[in-house]
């Protein structure tokens, strides 16, 4: 049944204003590209189910934050309850790439005592002719912070699915290995509902086998 | 009654307003309510306020901090964020206890112990029990129209009796709700219990709703249910429309503002503090939602009017957010309803021609379930959209560009928005139930009435969520009032600049 999922992950999407955060999320959740969109006020919410293995679904709850400076005090408060994040910059806007450091510093301060798994996203890769940030330097920066790097386009639907599902898989692995655990009072990871017992016992067997190795 | 001070004043004022509402209906009636209601409601109220500060099982540092300040605030002024929660909750609680008595509270009790939202049939059977229990009292009062009790008795009669004429009684009750949305908070059984639970457990509204939703999820996943079954779970649908998330975000803004307002108040003293307190008092008045007794406005308005009214109110707020999503959802709901009777009537006729009776019931049975599912979905969507709007408004009041509108003006407008939204919900629920009655004309009342009751219950729940969300805006506007005060000199400078250039 559609309503059933193993876990719910809360993801946060951050980055300078106008890099295309809302458009990327809308493409992912609604499957369409909005030509015109108003700047996000505070935060918006989206959700979608992702099937990471056959029959295993994760519900993603995506918090779309405003990039505008004036809403920063609001958006800061949301880091704490997120397990994963997409940090976006616009490949045609050098300034937005330079600000990646700042974004990471800010999250580091406000996410305590939890951690967020980030992926660095170079957005608007359909506009390759106007590129101001090379793939190489973006990859270097991502590696320096232990992040993956991916280039996406909401308009041409390039790598949008991959950006979200890869991140979801990485988090799922960490949860499976017990490096991220469900905690009371933390919204980052929530347990879903497994419909039948066979499913969950299969899970147990798998993790035991893993331990022996 | 008016001579009280401190904690109890606002609560009692609220109670008396509820009773005054009763007066609009019929004098004879409200008198009987008056006599029985007053002593009970006061004692209930005192008991609740006394009990509340003792409940402090908080593990979280933040909440315990909030609670400390709350109890302090209560002894000082009796207001504030949590204070006002208490206000509206207590008044509705006491009103119910006083006028309804044991019958309904047992309904509420049982409903809550079963599931997040009980199934319509469950509610109806409970209402039946309640009706039996309170029958004597009902006879004494000999009325259907006054006080919260009136609504329930009408509905229980509808459930008990057979035949179509009864449904008209149910619709009267729904019409009545339009005027009495404030009272209805108390009876919206699951919602009321949820909000009442909030008082006891020190949980926030979104937590309570989240729990209810999770219960529903658990239930739907354990039971091998059909996809259509899930479609009638209000909580799940409310979450699907991101209502819970927006509520949670609104709560965060509200709590932050509350803390800031308190720290400002603590830093002030003497005349400065008194003037500010006076201004904040005025602001609170705008949040008391007094205008539910407007008989004239009750008449049906054109389809365009809601869109126009809400859009206009939002332009008065001077925030950049627009209620388009809400009005679109609302208009879609109306278009759907309009299309329903024609379609099913045509279907039925054809069916009758071909099969002669027999299977026609099958067709209309599907139809009333469809209408019910769509009604619940629409209510959940409209409520989620409304709470989203309140959340966006809060964000923009706090961080938007400075506008030439005072916090009090904004509060008054928001209060009107809340009234309009609640009226719309009751009106919409009436449309849905009318549609259910028309389409289900051949149905047994046993299968039709629970659906009607469920629509009505979720509509009143929706109204209470919206009103609760509205109350969350109070600290936000308080903070905005304080910030406007301190920034007014620079504001004046900005205004003068263009003049100097000329």
UniProtKB/Swiss-Prot annotation, chain A:
Regulated by guanine nucleotide exchange factors (GEFs) including C9orf72-SMCR8 complex, which promote the exchange of bound GDP for free GTP. Regulated by GTPase activating proteins (GAPs) which increase the GTP hydrolysis activity. Inhibited by GDP dissociation inhibitors (GDIs). A lipid is attached at residues 211, 213 (S-geranylgeranyl cysteine). It is an enzyme of class 3 (hydrolase). The modification Phosphoserine is found at residue 201. Pfam families: Ras (PF00071). Changing residue 192 to R: In WSMN; impaired localization to cytoplasmic vesicles. The modification Cysteine methyl ester is found at residue 213. It is a lipid-anchor. It is found in: Cell membrane; Cytoplasmic vesicle membrane; Golgi apparatus; Cytoplasmic vesicle, Autophagosome membrane. It is linked to Intellectual developmental disorder, X-linked 72: A disorder characterized by significantly below average general intellectual functioning associated with impairments in adaptive behavior and manifested during the developmental period. Intellectual deficiency is the only primary symptom of non-syndromic X-linked forms, while syndromic forms present with associated physical, neurological and/or psychiatric manifestations. XLID72 patients can manifest autism spectrum disorder, seizures and macrocephaly as additional features. Waisman syndrome: A neurologic disorder characterized by delayed psychomotor development, intellectual disability, and early-onset Parkinson disease. The small GTPases Rab are key regulators of intracellular membrane trafficking, from the formation of transport vesicles to their fusion with membranes. Rabs cycle between an inactive GDP-bound form and an active GTP-bound form that is able to recruit to membranes different sets of downstream effectors directly responsible for vesicle formation, movement, tethering and fusion. RAB39B is involved in autophagy and may function in autophagosome formation. Belongs to the small GTPase superfamily. Rab family. This is Ras-related protein Rab-39B. It comes from Homo sapiens (Human).
């Amino acid at each position: 049944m559609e309503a059933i999922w193993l876990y719910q992950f809360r993801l946060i999407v951050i980055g300078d204003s106008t890099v295309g955060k809302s458009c990327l999320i809308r493409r992912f959740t609604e499957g369409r590209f909005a030509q015109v969109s108003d700047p996000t006020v505070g935060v918006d919410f989206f959700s979608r189910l992702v099937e990471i293995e056959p029959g295993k679904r994760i519900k993603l709850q995506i918090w779309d934050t405003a990039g505008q400076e004036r809403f920063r005090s609001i958006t800061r408060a949301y880091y704490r309850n997120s397990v994963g994040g997409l940090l976006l910059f616009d490949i045609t806007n050098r300034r937005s790439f330079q600000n990646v450091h700042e974004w990471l510093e800010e999250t580091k301060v406000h996410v305590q005592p939890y951690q967020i798994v980030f992926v660095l996203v170079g957005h608007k890769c359909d506009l390759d002719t106007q590129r101001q940030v090379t793939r190489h330097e973006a990859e270097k920066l991502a590696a320096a912070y232990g992040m993956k790097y991916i280039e996406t386009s909401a308009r041409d639907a390039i790598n949008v699915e991959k950006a979200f599902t890869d991140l979801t898989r990485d988090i799922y692995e960490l949860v499976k290995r017990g490096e991220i655990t469900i905690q009371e009072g933390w919204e980052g990871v929530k347990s879903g509902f497994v419909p039948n017992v066979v499913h969950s016992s299969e899970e147990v067997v798998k993790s035991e086998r893993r331990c022996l190795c | 009654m008016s001579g009280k001070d401190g904690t109890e004043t606002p609560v009692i004022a609220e109670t008396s307003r509820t009773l005054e509402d009763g007066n609009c209906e019929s004098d004879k009636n409200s008198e009987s309510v008056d006599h029985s209601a007053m002593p009970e409601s006061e004692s209930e109220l005192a008991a609740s306020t006394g009990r509340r500060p003792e409940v402090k099982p908080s593990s979280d540092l933040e909440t315990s901090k909030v609670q400390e300040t709350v109890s302090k605030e209560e002894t000082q002024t009796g207001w504030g964020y949590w204070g006002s929660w208490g206000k509206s909750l207590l008044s509705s609680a006491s009103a119910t206890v006083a006028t309804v008595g044991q019958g309904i509270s047992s309904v509420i009790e049982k409903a809550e112990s079963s599931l997040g939202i009980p199934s319509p049939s469950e509610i109806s059977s409970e209402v039946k029990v309640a009706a039996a229990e309170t029958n004597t009292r009902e006879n004494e009062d000999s009325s259907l129209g006054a006080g919260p009790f009136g609504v329930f008795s009408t509905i229980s009669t509808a459930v008990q009796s057979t035949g179509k004429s009864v449904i008209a009684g149910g619709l009267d009750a729904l019409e009545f709700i339009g005027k009495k949305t404030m009272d209805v908070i108390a009876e919206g059984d699951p919602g009321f219990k949820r909000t009442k639970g909030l008082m006891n457990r020190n949980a926030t509204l979104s937590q309570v709703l989240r729990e209810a939703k999770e219960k529903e999820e658990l239930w739907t996943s354990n039971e091998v249910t059909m996809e259509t079954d899930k479609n009638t779970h209000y909580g799940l649908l409310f979450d699907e429309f991101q209502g819970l998330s927006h509520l949670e975000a609104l709560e965060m803004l509200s709590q932050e503002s509350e803390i800031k307002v308190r720290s400002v108040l603590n830093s002030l003293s003497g005349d400065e503090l008194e003037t500010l307190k006076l201004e904040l008092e005025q602001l609170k008045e705008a949040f008391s939602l007094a205008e539910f007794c407007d008989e004239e406005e009750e008449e049906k308005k054109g389809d365009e009017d809601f869109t126009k009214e809400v859009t206009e109110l939002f332009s008065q707020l001077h925030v950049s957010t627009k209620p388009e999503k809400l009005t679109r959802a609302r208009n879609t709901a109306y278009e759907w309803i309009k299309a329903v009777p024609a379609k099913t009537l045509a279907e039925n006729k054809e069916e009758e021609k071909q099969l002669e009776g027999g299977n026609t019931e099958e067709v209309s049975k599907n139809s009333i379930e469809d209408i019910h599912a769509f009604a619940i979905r629409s209510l959940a969507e409209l409520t989620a959209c409304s709470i989203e709007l309140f959340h966006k408004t809060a964000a923009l009041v706090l961080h938007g560009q400075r506008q030439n509108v005072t916090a009090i003006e904004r509060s008054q407008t928001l209060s009107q928005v809340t009234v309009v939204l609640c009226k719309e919900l009751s009106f919409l629920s009436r449309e849905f139930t009318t549609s259910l009655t028309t389409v289900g004309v051949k149905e047994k009342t046993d299968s039709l009435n629970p659906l009607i009751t469920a629509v009505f219950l979720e509509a009143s729940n929706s109204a209470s969520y919206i009103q609760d969300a509205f109350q969350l805006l109070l600290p936000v506007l308080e903070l905005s009032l304080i910030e406007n005060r301190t920034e007014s000199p620079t504001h004046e400078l900005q205004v003068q600049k263009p003049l100097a250039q000329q």
